[in-house]
């Protein structure tokens, strides 16, 4: 038996940052198209909801609790967005340089990276890859203001809902998280090669079952 010890060196872990955003627009056939870099990404706020308990009573006592289905949502904030995202934001092109709004919104996938730091290695300790599937962006306001003596760039923001995808042996999910401090380096590289592309292959968004095959070495 061992006595509990708190705040040991190297175990004071924190998470911060957001970078390396990649957008994967979903085609009409349901397959994600090749990924494109999302520059200017400033924040992604994950907002799961649901799993609300409903108490059932019998024989004058609490009998059990049923929980509602859990859903995954998020808010994306950025200074800019890829041209490919316009179709996900309800825009369509009438011709080069001309777009119209209030059109059908395409679903998309998203990948981004956050830092996993600790008290010894700081921000160089590791990182997490966050994958989001079946996302759709809600309409959002865009606030333009006059240039003044305290200039600020417009920050775009989108609330996102998701439709989960199937995972063999588990409930469907709309999110996958990959921790570089725990996964084997070779398997992490194989996943990143798919996400970011290589000299020989386009960047793609692997589904959870494909990621599971890589992790299990199949």
Model-derived features with residue positions:
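Polar/acidic, low-complexity leader/linker segments enriched in S/T/G and N/D
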Residues: 1-46
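Mixed-charge, glycine-accented linear interaction segment located at domain edges/termini
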Residues: 139-142, 146-218
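Oligomerization/assembly interface segments of phage tail-like spikes and tubes
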Residues: 46-48, 56-57, 61-85, 150-165
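Surface-exposed loop/turn and secondary-structure junction residues enriched for glycine/proline
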Residues: 44-47, 88, 140, 181
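Membrane-targeting and insertion segments and their boundary/processing signals
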Residues: 43-50, 132
């Amino acid at each position: 038996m061992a006595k509990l010890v708190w705040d040991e060196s190297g175990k004071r872990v924190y998470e911060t940052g957001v970078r390396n955003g990649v957008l994967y627009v979903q085609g009409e056939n349901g397959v994600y198209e090749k990924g494109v870099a999302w520059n200017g990404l400033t924040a992604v706020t994950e907002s799961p909801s649901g799993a609300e308990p409903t108490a059932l009573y019998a024989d004058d006592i609490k009998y059990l609790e049923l929980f509602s289905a859990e859903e995954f949502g998020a808010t994306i904030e950025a200074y800019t967005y890829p041209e490919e995202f316009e179709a996900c934001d309800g825009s369509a092109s009438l011709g080069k340089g001309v777009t119209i709004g209030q059109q059908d919104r395409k679903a998309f996938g998203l990948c981004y990276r956050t830092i996993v730091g600790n008290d010894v290695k700081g921000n160089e300790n590791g990182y997490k890859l966050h994958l989001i599937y079946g996302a759709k962006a809600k309409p959002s306001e865009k606030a333009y203001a006059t240039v003044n003596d305290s200039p600020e760039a417009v920050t775009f923001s989108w609330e996102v809902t998701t439709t989960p995808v199937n995972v063999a042996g588990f409930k469907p999910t709309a999110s996958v998280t990959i921790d570089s401090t725990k996964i084997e380096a070779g398997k992490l590289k194989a996943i990143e090669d798919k996400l970011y592309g290589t000299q020989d292959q386009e960047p793609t968004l692997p589904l959870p079952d494909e990621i599971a095959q890589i992790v299990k070495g199949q």
